[in-house]
């Protein structure tokens, strides 16, 4: 019976790997009834599992392309929807800045595609006195999910696998190949997906073509997406909103009369003074508009967003006759645009703003006087850059972001299924990747309501204004990688050995350009009438003025070499890096598995700017894990690992405050992870509970070196990015899947339940004694504790299925938002990350699919089925001090409400 037992195990694992690969390797035999079967052969493509790279699988999640389709993943926010402890970092303008894991985020969570690091979150300091908190995008390019074969999410230090950036975790994507589209036993394949998401009116259309002729094969995927902003719950935007707008009214003063010279026949003062006009002054008028059209800090709805994405992936190759050797190429081009308007900026002037600006500017010649019946022409005040701006026009603030990724490369792959040579698998690849983030800020004051992004000042629109500011950040990599795998036995011990090597030449470049303003003036002068001396503005002696056509003035704001935000000198950092890693996962019979890995990284950076903190860094990372199997139904697991993050390019450039800063030595950030788990497994499925402890040290923040002078602490040198903090967190993670037919065989086959839970607790936060003007580390990046419970059914033949998910989130812990700031005088003050925190919430989602004749699959989902109104911490976190583009002066938090009941539909076709 032993042979039949092994056969049942193989079939069961195959079905579960298709349904939920994250748990596939833990499921044991026993779900089928005992019966004698004929010998058959089952061929299946190998699915990536949690324990492929690390023996314990602790902190790992794996999602395949099939999983992404079943979970209806259409964007970055859908990817981790049901995975507690992993959250998307909102960039504040529609894009994202990577992920947050275990209290860290952005550049402290590695993001790679086929081993290629994606662009860093680069936050440049903003202009003083402006509405922005960052001068650059701060985003990280998003991945096209229709190109993804599998994604592995690792929670906890993981630099032995992913290198720099995997301080708190990593997210690693693997790109599809032709085999993922070509069906078994076929020479070609076509896949198409059409999907609609109601939460953002998103439309996705993707088509994949693959073919094989002899040894030649190719894959082509094109994906297009369009979407808007994520719409808040309908209750959040109900009603109308009112605001004050400055409108012209006649001046009540008896000395406010005037005559315009060009409006008098023959330009004769005496013939016109009997019909003078009166100056205008500003008065607030209360106006009411829909919540969608309202502008100001009390806006109920999110800023409007227009999102578009176009992606091409082409992967040709040739497989030699013996199937062991493959040579191929890859070409990828993805462009995403995020165009948004910041509607928290009031479109219209108010009397308070008008008077304050006029007072600051002093007396403005011609204020109150206008030509013809155009009374708005007499209302203008002081604006930016010395320009005069009129109350006639509305202000619009727009951010246009374009993320462009280009990649092309070559690869050689050796696969030996017989495992009878020096390597079972070898891959040599070379990739050139360039990613650019073009962030264009535009401020217009030249259209009636501020909604026209394309309006510009002109001579016929006096007191109109426009400002442009563009920051383009790019990174390029030329990466050579080699990977080798070999399985072998020694003394009845099974070894799975892998070796990875890499060499990279990289460049980082930030360009500040198109930084200028335009404004339209008008010709104005006060005249003395020939026969009336010194008119005083009363009705009998009105002022005699000339109001003529205007002209457009353009002024450059860009400067060079002044070390402030207005410095448009290009920033360039380049260098090289290499790594070598070895890992061996050992099976010690049926009782234990042991694994260990070691990795060495070297990076050297250079810059023509002597103030850039370049240098050489050498780091050593390692991990070790063990799985004890005292019984068939029980695994005891434990792993330790380290992580590091090298200084980012923004940190190396430093903080510039007008003086020539000195380069400083910045060490890598370090982390140490300990994790222990227990796994129960059997016919019923599996259940895993784990405890983790993550310690972070040498965290990099902006501040000063401290020194003691005359018995008092004071700052030393210039502000810079320094190693200054350490922190420690602990937590628990639970996940599992229950097969109800395995629990009780009288229940129909196909019913299952899933469960996931994550909680993080802050244990310690410290600051180095030789640092000052430092903000203590605020853990706004921690996702509140969350439970996710699911109940589903998959028809055994895979024809149809339905799934319900309950998500419950606890409130954000206030203690994670409280901290202190060390002041320059040696004292400190209490600080708070943000003024608000989220309350507990829960939602119910239902989704299902139906397959027609194996070629067509209809999928549908109803999210927030009960139409519950709630706010996620990820949204509110955009108001926190650690946000990339912090939302300031928020009056109403309705705009952060999550969507109400919404629907997603998709049609998939596979041939």
From Swiss-Prot:
Which positions form S-S bridges? none
The residues covered by the TBDR beta-barrel domain are: 187-911
The membrane topology term of the UniProt record is: Multi-pass membrane protein
**InterPro entries xref list:** Plug_dom, Plug_dom_sf, TonB-dep_rcpt-like, TonB-dep_rcpt_b-brl, TonB_box_CS, TonB_Hb/transfer/lactofer_rcpt, TonB_lacto/transferrin_rcpt, TonB_rcpt_b-brl_sf
UniProt induction comment: By iron starvation.
Coiled-coil residues: none
Signal peptide range:
1-24
Q: Where is the TBDR plug domain?
A: 51-176
Q: Does the keyword RNA-binding apply?
A: no
Q: Where in the cell is it found?
A: Cell outer membrane
* Short motif TonB box, span: 38-45
Domain of life from the UniProt record = Bacteria
The UniProt keyword set, sorted, is:
Cell outer membrane, Membrane, Receptor, Signal, TonB box, Transmembrane, Transmembrane beta strand, Transport, Virulence
Q: NCBIfam families, from UniProt?
A: TonB-hemlactrns (TIGR01786), TonB-tbp-lbp (TIGR01776)
Similarity comment: family membership? Belongs to the TonB-dependent receptor family.
Q: What else is known?
A: N.meningitidis cells will only bind to human TF, not bovine or porcine TF, explaining at least in part the bacteria's inability to cause infection in non-human hosts.
PANTHER family from the entry?
TONB-DEPENDENT OUTER MEMBRANE RECEPTOR (PTHR30069), TRANSFERRIN-BINDING PROTEIN A (PTHR30069:SF54)
Q: What does this protein do?
A: Neisseria acquires iron by extracting it from serum transferrin (TF) in its human host. Acts as a TF receptor and is required for TF utilization. Binds both apo- and holo-TF, via the TF C-terminus.
Name it.
Transferrin-binding protein A
- Gene encoding this chain? tbp1
């Amino acid at each position: 019976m032993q042979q039949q037992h092994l056969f049942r195990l193989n079939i069961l694992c195959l079905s579960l790997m298709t349904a939920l690969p994250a748990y596939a390797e833990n499921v044991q035999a026993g779900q089928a009834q005992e019966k004698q079967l004929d010998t058959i052969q089952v061929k299946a493509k190998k699915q990536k599992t949690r324990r492929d790279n690390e023996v314990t699988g602790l902190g790992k999640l794996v999602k395949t392309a099939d999983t992404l389709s079943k979970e209806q993943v259409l964007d970055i926010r859908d990817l981790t929807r049901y995975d507690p402890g992993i959250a998307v970092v909102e960039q504040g303008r529609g894009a994202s800045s990577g992920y947050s894991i275990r209290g860290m985020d952005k550049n402290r969570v590695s993001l790679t595609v086929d081993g290629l690091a994606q662009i860093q979150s680069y936050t440049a300091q903003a202009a003083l006195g402006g509405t922005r908190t960052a001068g650059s995008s701060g985003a990280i390019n998003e991945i096209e999910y229709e190109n993804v074969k599998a994604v592995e999410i690792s929670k906890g230090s993981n630099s032995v696998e992913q290198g720099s950036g995997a301080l708190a975790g990593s997210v690693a994507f693997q790109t599809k190949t032709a085999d993922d589209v070509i069906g078994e036993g076929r020479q070609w394949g076509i896949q198409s997906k059409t999907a609609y998401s109601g939460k953002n009116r998103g439309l996705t259309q993707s088509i994949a073509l693959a073919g094989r002729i002899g040894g030649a094969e190719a894959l082509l995927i094109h994906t297009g997406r369009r979407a808007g902003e994520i719409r808040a719950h309908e209750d959040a935007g109900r009603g109308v909103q009112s605001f004050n707008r400055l409108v012209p009214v006649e001046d009540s003063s008896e000395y406010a009369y005037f005559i315009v010279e060009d409006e008098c026949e023959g330009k004769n003062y005496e013939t016109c003074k009997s019909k003078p006009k009166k100056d205008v002054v500003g008065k607030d008028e209360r106006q009411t508009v829909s919540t969608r059209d309202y502008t100001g800090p009390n806006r109920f709805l999110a800023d409007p967003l227009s999102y578009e994405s176009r992606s091409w992936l082409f992967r040709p190759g040739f497989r030699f006759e013996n199937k062991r050797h493959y040579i191929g190429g890859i070409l990828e081009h993805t462009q995403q645009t995020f165009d948004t308007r910041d509607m928290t900026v009031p479109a219209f002037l108010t009397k308070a703003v008008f008077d304050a600006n006029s007072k600051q500017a002093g007396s403005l010649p011609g204020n109150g006087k206008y030509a013809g019946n155009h009374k708005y022409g007499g209302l203008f005040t002081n604006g930016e850059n010395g320009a005069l701006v009129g109350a006639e026009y509305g202000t619009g603030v727009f951010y246009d972001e374009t993320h462009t990724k280009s990649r092309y490369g070559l690869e050689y792959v050796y696969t030996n299924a017989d495992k009878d040579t020096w390597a079972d698998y070898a891959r040599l690849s070379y990739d050139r990747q360039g990613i650019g983030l073009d962030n264009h800020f535009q401020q217009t004051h030249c259209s009636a309501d501020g909604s026209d992004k394309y309006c510009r000042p002109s001579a016929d629109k006096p007191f109109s204004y426009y400002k442009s500011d563009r920051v383009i950040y790019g990174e390029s990599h030329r990466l050579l990688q080699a990977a080798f795998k070999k399985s072998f036995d020694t003394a009845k011990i099974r070894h799975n050995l892998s070796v990875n090597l890499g060499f990279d030449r990289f460049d980082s470049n930030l360009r500040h350009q198109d930084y200028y303003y335009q404004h339209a003036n008008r010709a104005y002068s006060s005249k003395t009438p020939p026969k009336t001396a010194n008119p005083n503005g009363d009705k009998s002696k009105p002022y005699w003025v000339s109001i003529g056509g205007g002209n457009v003035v353009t002024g450059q704001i860009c400067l060079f070499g002044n070390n402030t935000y207005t410095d448009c000198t290009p920033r360039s950092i380049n260098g090289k890096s290499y790594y070598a890693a070895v890992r061996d996962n050992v099976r010690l019979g049926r009782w234990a598995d042991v694994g260990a890995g070691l990795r060495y990284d070297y990076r050297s950076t250079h810059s023509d700017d002597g103030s850039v903190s370049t240098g050489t860094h050498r780091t050593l990372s390692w991990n070790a894990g063990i799985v004890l199997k005292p019984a068939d139904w029980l695994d005891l697991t434990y792993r330790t690992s380290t992580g590091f993050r090298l200084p980012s390019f923004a940190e190396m450039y430093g903080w510039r405050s007008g003086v020539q800063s000195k380069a400083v030595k910045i060490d890598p950030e370090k982390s140490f992870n300990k994790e222990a788990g227990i796994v129960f497994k059997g016919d019923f499925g599996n259940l895993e509970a784990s405890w983790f402890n993550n310690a972070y040290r040498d965290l990099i923040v902006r501040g000063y070196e401290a020194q003691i002078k005359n018995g008092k602490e004071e700052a030393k040198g210039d502000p810079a990015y320094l190693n200054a903090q350490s922190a420690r967190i602990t937590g628990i993670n639970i996940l599992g899947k229950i097969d109800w037919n395995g629990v009780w065989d009288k229940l129909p086959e196909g019913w299952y339940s899933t469960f996931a839970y994550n909680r993080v607790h802050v244990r310690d936060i410290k600051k180095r004694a030789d640092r000052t003007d430092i903000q203590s580390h605020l853990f706004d990046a921690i996702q509140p504790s969350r439970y996710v419970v699911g109940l589903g059914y998959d028809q055994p033949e895979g024809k149809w299925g339905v799934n319900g998910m309950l998500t419950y989130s606890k409130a954000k812990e206030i203690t994670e938002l409280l901290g202190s700031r060390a002041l320059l005088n040696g004292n400190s003050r209490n600080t708070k990350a943000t003024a608000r925190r989220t309350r507990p919430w829960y939602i119910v989602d239902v989704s299902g699919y139906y397959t027609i004749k194996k070629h067509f699959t209809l999928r549908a989902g109803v999210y927030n089925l009960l139409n519950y109104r709630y706010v996620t911490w990820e949204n509110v976190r955009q108001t926190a001090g650690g946000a990339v583009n912090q939302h300031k002066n928020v009056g109403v938090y309705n705009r952060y409400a999550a969507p109400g009941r919404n629907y997603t539909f998709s049609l998939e076709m596979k041939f």
